[in-house]
């Protein structure tokens, strides 16, 4: 779409043209200095919606196995971080929490994300907690128009959180539909694309 940059600016409040050095170079450091949060702010935002601070468990059998092959006094303690304890059951809730916070802070009525998996459920979960409307634009169908079961299931999770799910086939129409939906609704763009 010819209006891509205009739509992106409207849907995020960021003019990416300010950060372009050349057709192949982008000033990410300048962008982060202008728009980023410090770590204390991130933790505060995530605590508000039950994200992060997930439990850490020792896998004792694995630790024992590693140590049985290691020299005496050596061998790691094997730990696993349980990110399923996040509000949406996914580590992607960490990124989604910041997007939903930013959308609410800037006064957007809703949030949109193009995704085929866990990020959609995370965005829908965080949007619900921030009282924002949510649309998930999802690649569901293969080239034979068969819905991929794991992606269909993620769409159901999004709907359970109150999101509207637009189901598409895999291909370039995903980005077109994202831009069109952003333009039509005026919602915040939480996509990772």
Describe the function of each predicted region.
Residues 1-193:
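PLP-dependent amino-acid enzyme catalytic core
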């Amino acid at each position: 779409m010819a209006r891509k940059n205009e739509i992106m600016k409207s849907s995020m409040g960021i003019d990416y043209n300010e950060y372009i050095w050349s057709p192949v170079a982008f000033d990410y450091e300048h962008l982060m200095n202008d728009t980023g949060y410090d770590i204390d702010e991130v933790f505060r935002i995530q605590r508000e919606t039950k994200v992060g601070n997930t439990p850490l468990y020792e896998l004792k059998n694995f630790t024992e196995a590693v140590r049985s092959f290691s020299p005496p006094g050596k061998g790691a303690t094997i730990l696993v971080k349980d990110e399923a304890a996040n509000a949406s059951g996914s580590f992607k809730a960490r990124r989604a929490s910041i997007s939903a916070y930013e959308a609410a802070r800037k006064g957007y009525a809703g949030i949109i994300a193009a995704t085929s998996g866990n990020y959609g459920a995370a965005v829908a979960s965080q949007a619900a907690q921030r009282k924002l409307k949510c649309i998930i634009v999802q690649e569901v169908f293969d080239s034979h128009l068969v819905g991929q079961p794991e992606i269909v299931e993620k769409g159901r999770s999004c709907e359970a959180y109150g999101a509207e799910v637009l189901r598409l086939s895999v291909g370039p129409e995903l980005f077109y539909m994202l831009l069109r939906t952003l333009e039509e609704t005026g919602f915040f763009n939480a996509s990772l694309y």
